[in-house]
Amino acid sequence: MIRNIILDMGNVLLDYNPEVILEKTLDNEEDRQIIRRELFGGPEWVQGDLGIIKNSERFDGVSQRVPSRLHPALKECVENWDICMVPVEGAVDFCREIKARGYGMYVLSNACNLFYEYFPKYFPFGSYRN
């Protein structure tokens, strides 16, 4: 008998698209490419997802690799990247249904320390640790 459902966050519950914050923050494709590569493709992104560093520490490392003229945009991307997360179509309804049927729901995913702040905005079903 199945009692619990385990879900991943990325591309299962939420689509992650860094272009959202890059296009909102930067007008120039060359500048977007720099921040895309150094922030979202850099080691600090992985370290944050692994819990090695906090989201607030990402700026410190990445800022050393981007021109200082881009630091305000970089800071904006670091602080507001969660707007890149959009629920996968049907995911919210699916989660409501499994909770209503009494299943335990667990989310296992590599995510930074801000997970408990941004995830409930999209999936407000209470604890994900049952």
Region annotations inferred by a language model:
Residues 35, 44-48, 95:
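Generic hydrophobic alpha-helical segments
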Residues 20-21, 43, 57, 61, ...:
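Alpha-helical elements of Rossmann-like donor-binding domains used by nucleotide-donor carbohydrate transfer enzymes
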Residues 45-77:
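A metal-dependent, Asp-based hydrolase signature
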Residues 71-106:
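Short, acidic loop-to-helix structural element flanking the phosphoryl-transfer center
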Residues 113-130:
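Substrate-recognition "cap/lid" segment bordering the active-site pocket of phosphatases
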Residues 8-11, 51, 98, 107:
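Generic structural signal for small/hydrophobic residues in well-ordered secondary structure
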Residues 110:
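Cofactor-binding loop segments of dinucleotide-utilizing enzymes, especially the Rossmann-like FAD-
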Residues 1-41, 64-65:
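Active-site neighborhood of HAD-like aspartate-dependent phosphohydrolases
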